[in-house]
Amino acid sequence: MQCPYCNYKESKVIDSRHTDLKSIRRRRECESCKKRFTTYEKIETTPLMVIKKDNSREYFDREKIKYGLLKACEKRPVSIDEIESIVVHIENEINKCFIEEIETKKIGEMVMDKLKELDEVAYVRFASVYRQFKDINTFVNELKSILIEKGDK
């Protein structure tokens, strides 16, 4: 593995750990400059295509989910680990279905379900962008549904 600091081609593995069922985290040390860096290995699978609202298709990108979650959880008591856990959960749920295509609507619903469990404010933020809330009444209605749901528990 090439060193990201000095570009030397050889490094040794210091530590290997499974991060989830599909990836391995490796801590490496450059044999030239002795600096350490981390790499991740993942199983390569058939690429998943996402069907967008306009029916165009693009490759599934976990970073888009992560970015949306980061924006929704900004200034909220939600850790990066919790966000990463949601992304991994959604990826695993999609992979369990053995599908080659999925609609953005389905992914968005999965994200909202997990956010609703984690942080209601982040959920409303995400939902407002995802569902394109047009006015304050839409916000109020969404908040009412959350309050009603909480009352049922």
Curated annotation (Swiss-Prot):
Q: Name one GO molecular function term.
A: DNA binding
Q: Give the cofactors, semicolon-separated.
A: Zn(2+)
One family from Pfam that matches here is Zn_ribbon_NrdR
Cofactor binding, note field: Binds 1 zinc ion.
Show where the ATP-cone domain sits.
Answer: 48-138
**Family statement drawn from the similarity comment of this UniProt entry:** Belongs to the NrdR family.
Its biological purpose is as follows: Negatively regulates transcription of bacterial ribonucleotide reductase nrd genes and operons by binding to NrdR-boxes.
Q: What is this protein called?
A: Transcriptional repressor NrdR
Per the UniProt record, the source organism is Clostridioides difficile (strain 630)
Q: What is the lineage of its organism?
A: Bacteria, Bacillati, Bacillota, Clostridia, Peptostreptococcales
The gene is: nrdR
